[in-house]
Amino acid sequence: MSDFRFIFFGTPEIAAASLDALKARGMLPVLIVTAPDKPRGRGLVMTPSLVRLWGDAHGIPVLTPTKLSDESFVGEIAKIKADVFVVVAYGKILPEKLLSLAPRGTLNMHPSLLPKHRGPSPIESQVLIEESVEHVGVSVMLLDQEMDHGPILKQKKAVLSEWPVPASVLYDALGRTGAELLAETLPLWVSGDISPAAQDHSTATYCAKIKKEDGLLNLLDDATTNYRKFLAYDMWPRTYFMHEVGGKPSRVIITEAALEDGVFVIKKVIPEGRREMLYEQFLKNA
């Protein structure tokens, strides 16, 4: 087991994968902080995050604060006397009074090769923009008070046999790569065997939070652009186009598509209120 104490902040699957990698190398957090349970599904059943489930399964205390600045929560963190914090897709920015409680700082795994793709949607942004897999990867960095701005400890390029790929594929690939890189970097940082390197802020690029309407396609737009959007938004919000039914606009979700000889070819769709069908069948009935 590790000879240092750390608190882990994270919420989704990519964070749970990092916990698995840390555990495989003998590192378990003394505390986990994750998002509160959320209503999910048609029944709006209150559902814990995957990281909370991971913590419960491994007998690790879990906190689910609604406000990170709450004095009682900050007090709980202070009592732990952790050496270092680790953040993977937690979902909120840690305030300074929280960051100051970790003597060895706070490590963050960010799924892009910083300073490119700073922000909340780096995976989708890489699928939308990057021309080569050579520019796709993950970073382990130290957090500061600016978004994805702190110095870099280690980076690693993605291992993919083709490019571009759907965001869901990149999410899994970078989740695995990032988890291993984090597990490799954390003990090196705590022991003082690795030094941080400042980012070149002059080359930074930024990505925005994805909105539902980002998935709307104009089928007359550039074919490559539409195909990249189809790949980038395959998890959420998915790509769609509008079709008039009975004088009213109706959404048609694209479930399968390809870029063939420079043409964006739609293969399958789900018209609003109907089941998935071949695009040819949809056109016949449109």
Residue ranges and their predicted role:
Residues 4, 25-28, 84-204:
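Donor/substrate-binding cores of folate-linked one-carbon enzymes
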Residues 199-217:
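Flexible, acidic loop-helix segments that line cofactor/substrate-binding pockets
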Residues 10, 32, 55, 85, ...:
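A residue-level signal for conserved active-site and pocket-lining positions in enzyme catalytic cores
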Residues 38-56:
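N-terminal beta-loop-helix "entrance" segment that forms/cooperates
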Residues 1-42:
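N-terminal Rossmann-like dinucleotide-binding module
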Residues 63-72:
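Glycine-rich, highly charged phosphate/nucleotide-binding loops
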Residues 214, 219-286:
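An anion-binding loop in the catalytic cleft
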Residues 71-81:
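Short amphipathic alpha-helix with an adjacent loop that forms part of the alpha/beta core around
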